[in-house]
Amino acid sequence: MELIEILLKKLNKNAVVTEIAKDKDPFKVLISTIISARTKDEVTEEVSKKLFKEIKDVDDLLNIDEEKLADLIYPAGFYKNKAKNLKKLAKILKENYNGKVPDSLEELLKLPGVGRKTANLVITLAFNKDGICVDTHVHRICNRWEIVDTETPEETEFELRKKLPKKYWKVINNLLVVFGREICSSKSKCDKCFKEIKEKCPYYEKIKHFENILKKFNFRKVSKNKIPNEKGTYILKIRLKEGKKIKFGKTERFFKKGYYFYIGSAFGNSMNLKNRIERHLKDDKKMHWHIDYLLKYGKIEEIYITNERVECEVANEFIKKFDFVENFGCSDCKCKSHLFYLKP
């Protein structure tokens, strides 16, 4: 938990919903959190201020016209659906909870538009109860830091409940939302990260190791439409958006969502980097190599090439820091794998 402690000392900023929650009004926290889904921070802040000038409590929400409500929360993402859910929410709160927001996770989860993230945020921010709010930022960063190894935010929440000391439960969401939006985003800005974090971050260690491999073997990045007619070794960076069970050869295994680095080469008499990599890029190809089966579901995002004959040497460098898919793409050599994994 050393990385969390470092961030607590380094960051002095609140996420928007945390700011809204300062007056401990459960109604405002609940409504703002629902609005914040799939919505940028600055939009959530603007919409919440505009909305709470007209909507002070459940009765106001119950009495407002749905179309007017939708106009008030525009341009929040899915504003029409959110307006519909907020109207349903107001009715249920009035009829079942005397117009009050319930203070338990179980009751909050019964409300329309309320998932585990929202429910946990309400009980922690509005009622000061123990909960762990896991959104995409918390899920992504806890996986990158190898605190958990999970596929979904819900899985991350349950793992954190087992592993995370309770003193961090209430603060981890605000901490990692701010850090995730500004630095450790889906396209990480490692160059902007704190030196103390980089020294201990397992994700940064892998990113740096990959950069060192590129330098060591003189790789250069090329675009898909400018692959040269040259001999050489290549690395494909492939993105798999969702976890998938994939069969290659006689083997079937689950491939986690994230990034895969595949190492290949083109040194045959009639083979060069251009025709080899362009074959990988085709959708309508005969399934032959292991990589063909992964590319049926994954997308090539980056291509790196070198004119050096270093396929196995590169694989042996990757294996020092990266997880690998055993026996993938290496049937004609002694390498353990030519496919390596990086969490998203």
From Swiss-Prot:
Q: Which PANTHER family match?
A: ENDONUCLEASE III-LIKE PROTEIN 1 (PTHR43286:SF1)
Q: Give the family, as the similarity comment puts it.
A: Belongs to the Nth/MutY family.
Q: Name one GO biological process term.
A: base-excision repair, AP site formation
Source organism (scientific name): Methanocaldococcus jannaschii (strain ATCC 43067 / DSM 2661 / JAL-1 / JCM 10045 / NBRC 100440) (Methanococcus jannaschii)
Cofactor or coenzyme needed: [4Fe-4S] cluster
Per UniProt, residues of the HhH domain are 105-124
The cofactor note reads:
Binds 1 [4Fe-4S] cluster.
State the name under which the record lists this protein.
Endonuclease III
The residue range of the signal peptide is: none
Q: Name one Pfam family in it.
A: DUF123
Question: Which SUPFAM superfamilies does the record cross-reference, listed alphabetically?
Answer: DNA-glycosylase
* Binding of [4Fe-4S] cluster, residues: C184, C190, C193, C201
Which EC number(s) does the record attach to this protein? 4.2.99.18
| Catalytic activity reported | 2'-deoxyribonucleotide-(2'-deoxyribose 5'-phosphate)-2'-deoxyribonucleotide-DNA = a 3'-end 2'-deoxyribonucleotide-(2,3-dehydro-2,3-deoxyribose 5'-phosphate)-DNA + a 5'-end 5'-phospho-2'-deoxyribonucleoside-DNA + H(+)
